[in-house]
């Protein structure tokens, strides 16, 4: 796909305007708020084919391709669940469609992954990409879901990349792109240690000096043997009690985590339904629909509450009225 070319001003200098293949000139546009350059690239080329062909890359090849294009150090397909790589791909294909300053390249938690995918969804909408992003599946870090999406994105990249140079490190403006942790690692799986290694008698057995040949070892008295065996049994019981308590605590935490995840998925589904309704009625130029879309796609905590000052003013206005009633 040939890319746009830049025209020259009458004095022969580059004026950063863009001329398309059909001769239409698109003037250079600049965001006055953030001072970022944004070019109008038109609509993206949508890709609908998801069938496996000879061009489909293996998981090792596709991770090597991702690392090579955007200078990352991913080792597994599952690490694409953070969404950061896709955000940088969109900045590479369509400069100005996404702000990399808001992308969390060091994301480690699921809500940070969702934040990145919200930015990706907004860039898809801005470039009229029809692909539905299965966010609730991708952020789980499952291999097959992430492999299917990156294979589709590779075809989307091939259909829209025009061969222009791009420096991913410079585009991130110094942000360290740390790979997310392996989703397969469970925080509850602690390394198992043998009970013999943790027993208080194990260290004593190892540290006891070897008896010299020919010398008769002295036998400990019955009182010492009884005291040592009693202390060892008490230590074993204490350790067993502690293990039981920790297992109960882990079980309760797992139940709490499952409940939170179900609640999150429930509200995420509601927000997704609201988003689809807003997109269906987005062409009607309804102010309420636009305000809802702004709240849904807000990437900053403060951007999602633009009406809080007005609410405070209404409270202050109602207080004198209540005093007059008394």
Swiss-Prot record:
Modification sites for Phosphoserine: 9, 218, 235
DCTN1-binding: region residues: 186-326
Molecular-function annotations in GO: microtubule plus-end binding
PTMs per UniProt: Phosphorylated at Ser-235 by CK2 leading to enhanced cell adhesion. Phosphorylated by CDK1 and AURKB during mitosis reduces the binding affinity of MAPRE2 for microtubules.
PROSITE patterns: CH (PS50021), EB1_C (PS51230)
Segments of skewed composition (Low complexity): 199-233, 317-326
Subunit structure: Interacts with DCTN1. Interacts with APC (via C-terminal). Interacts with monomeric and polymerized tubulin. Interacts with SLAIN1. Interacts (via the N-terminal region) with BAG1. Interacts with ASB14. Interacts with HAX1; this interaction is essential for epidermal cell migration.
Role, per record: Adapter protein that is involved in microtubule polymerization, and spindle function by stabilizing microtubules and anchoring them at centrosomes. Therefore, ensures mitotic progression and genome stability. Acts as a central regulator of microtubule reorganization in apico-basal epithelial differentiation. Plays a role during oocyte meiosis by regulating microtubule dynamics. Participates in neurite growth by interacting with plexin B3/PLXNB3 and microtubule reorganization during apico-basal epithelial differentiation.
Protein name per its UniProtKB record: Microtubule-associated protein RP/EB family member 2
Lineage: Eukaryota, Metazoa, Chordata, Craniata, Vertebrata
Gene: MAPRE2
């Amino acid at each position: 796909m040939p890319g746009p070319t830049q025209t020259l001003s009458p004095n022969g200098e580059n004026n950063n305007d863009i001329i398309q293949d059909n001769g239409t000139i698109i003037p250079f546009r600049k965001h006055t708020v953030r001072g970022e350059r944004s070019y109008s690239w038109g609509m993206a080329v949508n890709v609908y084919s998801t069938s496996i062909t000879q061009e489909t890359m293996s998981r090792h090849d596709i991770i090597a391709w991702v690392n090579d294009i955007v200078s990352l150090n991913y080792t597994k397909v599952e690490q694409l669940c953070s969404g950061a790589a896709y955000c940088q791909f969109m900045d590479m294909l369509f400069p100005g469609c996404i702000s990399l300053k808001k992308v969390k390249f060091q994301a480690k938690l699921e809500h940070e992954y969702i934040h990145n995918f919200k930015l990706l969804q907004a860039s898809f909408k801005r470039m009229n990409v029809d692909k539905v992003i299965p966010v609730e599946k991708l952020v789980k870090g499952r291999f097959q879901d992430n492999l299917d999406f990156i294979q589709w994105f590779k075809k989307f990249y091939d259909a829209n990349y025009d061969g222009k140079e791009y420096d991913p490190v410079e585009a991130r403006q110094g942000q360290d792109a740390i790979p997310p942790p392996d989703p397969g690692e469970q925080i509850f799986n602690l390394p198992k240690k043998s009970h013999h290694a943790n027993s208080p008698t194990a260290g004593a057995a190892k540290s006891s000096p070897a008896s010299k040949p020919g010398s008769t070892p002295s036998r400990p008295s019955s009182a010492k043997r009884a005291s040592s065996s009693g202390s060892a049994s008490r230590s074993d019981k204490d350790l067993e009690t502690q293990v039981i308590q920790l297992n109960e605590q882990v079980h309760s935490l797992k139940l709490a985590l499952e409940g939170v995840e179900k609640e999150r998925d429930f509200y995420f589904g509601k927000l997704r339904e609201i988003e689809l309704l807003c997109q269906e009625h987005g062409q009607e130029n309804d102010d309420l629909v636009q305000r809802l879309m702004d709240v849904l796609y807000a990437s900053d905590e403060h951007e999602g509450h633009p009406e809080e000052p007005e609410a405070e003013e209404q409270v202050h206005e109602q207080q004198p009225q209540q005093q007059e009633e008394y």
